[in-house]
């Protein structure tokens, strides 16, 4: 009787009661989560913003805003060389962290890529290209793809590069004679897209011939944007979850699917056509695969296609960005420009003398390139890895299994812990022996890894260096460079000076207007 009266007094639960109960439950769960992340998590002792320690939202927001390199640089400047950037994630700028995270490890398995990472190439039919493959699959594919990237292969590809460099110089000469300012960023993009198409499957994009980009080239640049947005979504929603799929549809533009379709379908068609023409004597990547029985046996047709999709995207805009960044630094530093120009013109009596084996021997030109790669890395964003099941030590810090770790490349090269006067463009810091500058003797050069390092380091590093040296040496041999003295030209220089640009895995470079004059001899 008493119980019945009590129930009647209390009444039946209402929507308000249920709402209060749900709210209370959420608050309790959130409080427990915060307490666990702040006081009981294995990473609790590492410094970082309070919000980052309890949620992935700040890290995801940095990606969505296309500002991760800048955001992480600010965090490291405030909190030090090791920062907790997410509840279970650390970012490092220590030199030794490069090898500890990305290097060839002996006592532990190599770190796997984080499932958060997604590049320009998605899996297909359960297969992946080398970029997203697990360690075992990565080793198999890398071994099968290694032959086209050796120095011997580069020498065979030298004539391919020369054709496109000659086209670039011819186009620039016409601009110079007409006294037209040149947007070098665009022309470098035309050049690198044509080169990588010819190198991959003997089919240049035709950008240099038309003096403009095409739909395929534009799609590749946009794919980097979609991949970065997807990484941000994965941070808060997980990988492959219903929430992940829903947020992808909401956040990523519908045309992103078209970007991937254009890139994939074109790459697939070109790859299959090249595979069907094994007798063609052209030293492209697929020709090397066709000529190697081991490579043909190790790679499925789908894997070959996926890797060509990757090489086209990874070997085009990133290289153009480096060329444009180098040109900006040359324009900003006339003393360095004059010294590099004098070195190139003294070394070569004719442009035909500019070759792989000769251009790599120019110490000052190469020093300017290394310094440009330091200050304007083609890959400035963190590349997350996961600590293996046995745990690992990174930069002297014992870390448990499952911890996500990475190096912040842009923060590392701008840290005074690694480089003296880090914001200064100083090619002298890369000179050895007689040309070395004692001010930079203590620089930790290993902090600059523009092509990453270890088993997943960039396969195209040698090709990129060759392409960069060849194009830049030809530019200095043929032309005198000056910044364009116009309102648009000055605004572009301001944006470069402040690194006022978005980052979607690589930099979205601003225009760079240059006045060219033919060299007088």
Curated annotation (Swiss-Prot):
It is found in: Membrane. Glycans are attached at residue 366. GO terms for cellular component: membrane. It is an enzyme of class 1 (oxidoreductase). Keywords: Glycoprotein, Heme, Iron, Membrane, Metal-binding, Monooxygenase, Oxidoreductase, Transmembrane, Transmembrane helix, Virulence. Its cofactor is heme. Belongs to the cytochrome P450 family. It comes from Pyricularia oryzae (strain 70-15 / ATCC MYA-4617 / FGSC 8958) (Rice blast fungus). Induction: Expression is induced in spores. Pathway: Hormone biosynthesis. Its EC number is 1.-.-.-. One of its GO terms (biological process) is abscisic acid biosynthetic process. PROSITE patterns: CYTOCHROME_P450 (PS00086). It comes from the Eukaryota. The chain crosses the membrane at residues 15-35. Cytochrome P450 monooxygenase involved in the biosynthesis of abscisic acid (ABA), a phytohormone that acts antagonistically toward salicylic acid (SA), jasmonic acid (JA) and ethylene (ETH) signaling, to impede plant defense responses. During pathogen-host interaction, ABA plays a dual role in disease severity by increasing plant susceptibility and accelerating pathogenesis in the fungus itself. It is a single-pass membrane protein. Its main location: membrane. This is Cytochrome P450 monooxygenase ABA2. GO terms for molecular function: heme binding; iron ion binding; monooxygenase activity; oxidoreductase activity, acting on paired donors, with incorporation or reduction of molecular oxygen. The keyword Heme applies. Pfam families: p450 (PF00067). Heme binds at residue 458.
């Amino acid at each position: 009787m008493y119980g019945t009266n009590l129930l009647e007094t209390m009444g039946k639960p209402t929507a308000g009661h249920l709402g209060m109960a749900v709210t209370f439950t959420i608050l309790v769960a959130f409080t427990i989560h915060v307490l666990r992340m702040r006081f009981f998590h294995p990473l609790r002792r590492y410094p970082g913003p309070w919000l980052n320690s309890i949620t992935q939202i700040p890290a995801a927001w940095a990606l969505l805003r296309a500002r991760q390199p800048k955001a992480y640089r600010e965090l490291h400047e405030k909190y030090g060389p090791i920062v907790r950037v997410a509840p279970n994630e650390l970012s490092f700028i220590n030199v030794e962290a490069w090898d500890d995270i990305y290097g060839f490890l002996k006592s532990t398995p190599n770190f796997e890529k984080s499932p958060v990472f997604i590049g320009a190439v998605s899996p297909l039919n359960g297969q992946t290209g080398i970029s997203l493959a697990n360690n075992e699959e990565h080793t198999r594919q890398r071994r099968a793809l290694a032959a086209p990237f050796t120095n011997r292969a580069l020498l065979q590809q030298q004539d391919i590069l020369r054709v496109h460099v000659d086209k670039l110089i011819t186009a620039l000469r016409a601009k110079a004679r007409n006294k037209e300012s040149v947007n070098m960023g665009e022309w470098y993009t035309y050049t690198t897209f044509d080169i990588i198409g010819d190198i991959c499957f003997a089919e240049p994009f035709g950008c240099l011939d038309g003096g403009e980009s095409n739909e395929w080239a534009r799609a590749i640049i946009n794919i980097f944007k979609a991949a970065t947005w997807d990484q941000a979504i994965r941070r808060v929603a997980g990988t492959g979850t219903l929430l992940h799929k829903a947020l992808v549809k909401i956040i990523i533009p519908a045309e992103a699917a078209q970007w991937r379709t254009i890139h994939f379908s074109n790459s697939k068609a070109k790859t299959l056509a090249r595979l069907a023409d094994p007798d063609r004597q052209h030293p492209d990547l697929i020709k090397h695969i066709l000529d190697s029985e081991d490579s043909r046996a190790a790679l499925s047709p789908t894997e070959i296609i996926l890797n060509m999709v990757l090489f086209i995207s990874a070997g085009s805009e990133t290289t153009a960005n480096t060329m444009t960044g180098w040109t900006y630094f040359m324009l900003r530093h006339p003393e360095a420009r004059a010294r590099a120009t004098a070195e190139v013109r003294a070394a070569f009596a004719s442009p035909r003398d500019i070759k792989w084996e000769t251009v790599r021997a120019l110490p000052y030109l190469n020093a300017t390139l290394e310094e440009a790669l330091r200050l304007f890395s083609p890959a400035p964003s963190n590349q997350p890895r996961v600590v293996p099941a046995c745990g690992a030590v990174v930069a002297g810090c014992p870390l448990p299994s499952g911890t996500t770790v990475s190096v912040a490349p842009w923060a590392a090269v701008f840290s005074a812990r690694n480089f003296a006067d880090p914001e200064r463009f100083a090619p002298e810091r890369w000179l050895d022996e007689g040309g070395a500058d004692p001010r930079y003797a203590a620089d930790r050069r290993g902090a600059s890894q523009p092509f990453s390092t270890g088993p997943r380091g960039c396969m195209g590093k040698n090709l990129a260096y060759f392409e960069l040296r060849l194009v830049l040496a030809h530019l200095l041999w043929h032309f005198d460079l000056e910044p364009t003295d116009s309102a648009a030209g000055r605004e572009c220089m301001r944006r470069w000076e402040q690194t006022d640009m978005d980052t979607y895995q690589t930099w979205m470079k601003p225009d760079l207007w240059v006045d060219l004059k033919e060299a007088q001899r």
